[in-house]
Each structure stands twice: as C-alpha cells, then as structure tokens.
Amino acid sequence: MRDRRPAFRRTALACAWLFSSAAFAAASPDAQPEAPEADLAIHAQPATQWTGVWTRQNLLGDIGGLRPWLGKYGVTFSLQETSEYLANLRGGLKRGGTYDGLTTAAVTVDTQKAFGLPGGTFNASALQIHGRNLSQYNLGTLNTASGIEAQDTTRLWELWYQQSFLDQRVDVKIGQQSLDQEFIVSQYAATFVNTMFGWPALPSYDLPNGGPAYPLSALGVRVRGRITPSLTALAGVFDGDPLGNNPNNLSGTNFNLHNGTLFIGELQYALNQPADGQMDMGPSNALPGTYKIGVWYHNGRFADQQTDNTGLSLANPASSGVARAHHGDYSFYAVADQMVWRPDPTGAKSLGVFARVMAAPGDRNLVSVAANAGVVLKAPFEGRDNDSVGLALTYVKIGSHARALDEDFASFTDGPYGVRTSETTLEATYQYQVTPWWQLQADAQYTFNAGAGQNPSDPTQPLRNTFVVGLRTNITF
C-alpha cells in the first residue's frame, strides 16, 4: 500500500469514511478467552502498532496518545461501523436495494491494571442501528440476508463483569449478555453475510423474540471451565425473554427476570491447538479444528403450531383460536470447524470447512431443523494473505405442525394456500482486506423456495426464488 500515489490515498480514505464498518461480532471482548478455541481465521497480527494510516490496526491510530494512556489503566475503547448495500435482483416481495448500517462502541476494563484485582474484566457495549432491512421489505425469506438487520435504534447491548479463578481454568460472567458471542458459534461461518451463519435460524424463530442474541441481550450467569487442555465446558442461565415485559424496549435497559428461564450448555473440543499455558512449539503440519455439542432448554410455555386447546385445528372455523400450550422447549446442536488443507504451516493460505446442525420439536416450533455448511479459503491469491473467499449453504425446515396447519387452511378454504416446507440459501462471498482497519466484502445470495413456499404478505401466493447481491464495508476506528 505504500506505493500508492497521494491522490489515490485521498480518494480511498474518503471512500472509507463514506462506507465505514467493522464486523461487530469479531470485536467482542470474549475473544480474549481463557478457552482453548483457536482463531481459525488465522488473521495476521503485527507485533507493533505502526503509525502509518495505511498500516496501523485502527483508522484513528492511538488518537493522539489517548489509547496507550487508557491502556495503562486497563481501559480499552473500540468503535466500529458496518455499512452495506444489498439489492434483490429477482423474486421475493419486490426488486430493489436498501442500505443498512451498524455502529458498535465498546469499553473493556482489565481490573488488574485498573485497581489491582487480578482476573477481572468489565465490559459495556452499545449499538446504533440504522438503515432499512432488505429481507423485511424486499425478500420475505426465512434465511434473512444480513446479520446486521434489526430495528433502527440506539441501544445498550452487553453489560457484564467476568472473573477468572484457579489460574484461569474457570471463569464466571454475570450481567447482560448476548449468547451469540459465545454459544453455537462457528468461526468459519462468521465469514458470511446471511444472518443464519451467525445466530442460527432455529433459535431465531423458536425462542421468545429470537432469544438473547444480536441486537438483544439478557440478564444471566455464564460459567466456563477448562476440563482438560483441549476440552472446555460452558453453561449459562439467562432470562427467557430478552424484551421482557416491554416489547418496545428499544433502549436495551429493561433488565428483566420475569419471563421464564433459558438454560444452555456446550462442550468444546479443540483439536491440534496449544492450550493456555502450554509452550507453542512453532509451526506444525497438524491442522487445527474445533468441535462443539450443546443443548438449550426454556421452561416457558409455547403454543402448538397446529392444534387449539380443544384439540381442533387452528384452521377449523369452529376452533377456539387459542393454541394448545406446551410446557418447555428445547434443542440439541452440533458445530464443527476444521482446517483441511494448508500447504505451508508458516503461511497464511489454508482451506477450512464448517458444519452446524440443530433440531427441536416440530409441534411447538416454527422451525424444527436448521443447518448450514460451507468452505472458506484464506489467502486465495499471492500477496492477499488477509483475504478470504467462501461458499456456503444454509437450510431451514418448517416444523411438522406448522406445515400441517398450512395444509388444514388449504383444506378448509378450498382454495390455493401456500404450504411451507423448507428454504435453502446459497451464498458466495469475498472479503478484501484493503488495510488492517478497512475491509470490503462482495456478496451474492440465491434463495430456493423463498418463504419456504409461502408469501408472508399473501399466504395464498408463493414467492419466486430471490437473488441478492451487495457490498459490505467494515472499518475499525
């Protein structure tokens, strides 16, 4: 980048300000973990903070000495922006494009440096969400096109304190937390833009208000323990509804404990990765991977997707209209991230694959099965060590009772009625690292059987398959 002419530098810098962004999930303080999971993204990290605008890690550098001064007292401040323009070229609800944006600010305090308490971390973060959601207005798909889509607002995101014990083998986090920062995470899947490669479709549609995941969070306690150098266990107890008693809780400050309880547990196995405290023996031909299994349980009451409280179909004109209630809901899941090829153990080029699958009861849930899988190539071209190119598929299956209800409506109305079955989205993406602080991402998504076979605006009509293209830009300030 040093060979660029000044005019080009000025132009590129102006573009950066116009299209600024940074992947919000990647900046979570949870990425400093005591857990053994490796960063399979293998991003190159310089040993020093260079001062040149094109080579430093943050656009604003040390902000005139402010960052290092705060760092002496254990305070880390981050500001990031994600901006994107996505357009639907065919099918769905209508053609056209929309702009979406997300600003994330976070403050982390290391209590050892701040006031001498070892092993403590305090975190507070906030979101400013702006723009218009393509999926809601143009697509009508279940696999929503962008992981930053949400209602426009400025809100508190996370507010928690974490304390480690036993030489960092155990840590406890308490406070307002977003589960998608630690649970059900696939690092390779995070390369992609579609929402379902982040927080999956199944909890998004089956838990109250989508569960405590971006842009929401919930009060709770999470415990993490390193059982062996390669095996880590996580368990958490959280409020069951992140919006609580106030569905218009746009500020994120309605701290609620009155809407059921969500329990979640996960085991993580790290393959071919040095654990904390172990000596790094240098480059190895062994290929790293991470494997996870987990379960969540919610003790609230969940409406049957087909039957009312008298045993009739909800589509029956004689139905009471009150769905039969089920006590509790649950899901099992598995996640795998595995590097499968790396020609040079000292180089950046590598090929990784991922898979994630979840299942839940079909009687009380709109989505009974959700899965995604894909492949990611790091450093695809010579001299592009921090670029990534990926191809992935995400799949949603409608629960048996929701599907049966559609069939009942078709029978009782004696006319056309879309029966929802499943929906699949194929995504291809390329991340181009312009500078350490600026990334451009070109993206294309094609959705098969959009809306799972039903138009959400008119259930008697189907949706045509959608084709979405767009550009996302990420900036770390």
Q: Predicted segment positions?
A:
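N-terminal periplasmic/intermembrane-space "pro-region" immediately following the signal or transit peptide
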Residues: R2-D3, C15-W17, S21-T82, N88, ...
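Transmembrane beta-strand segments of Gram-negative outer membrane beta-barrel proteins
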Residues: P46-V53, R67-R90, F122-A124, R132, ...
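Short loop/turn motifs that connect adjacent beta-strands in outer-membrane beta-barrel proteins
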Residues: G61-F77, D110-F122, L166-R169, S230, ...
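Transmembrane beta-barrel strands of outer-membrane/channel proteins
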Residues: F77-Y85, F122-Q128, V172-Q176, A233-D239, ...
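Residues on the lipid-exposed face of transmembrane beta-strands in outer-membrane beta-barrel proteins
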Residues: L79, A105-T111, E158-Q163, V221-G225, ...
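Outer membrane beta-barrel
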Residues: G96-P242, N365-N372, F381-L405
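Outer membrane beta-barrel transmembrane domains
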Residues: E266-Y269, G294-H327, R342, P361-V369, ...
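Outer-membrane beta-barrel "beta-signal"
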Residues: L463-F477
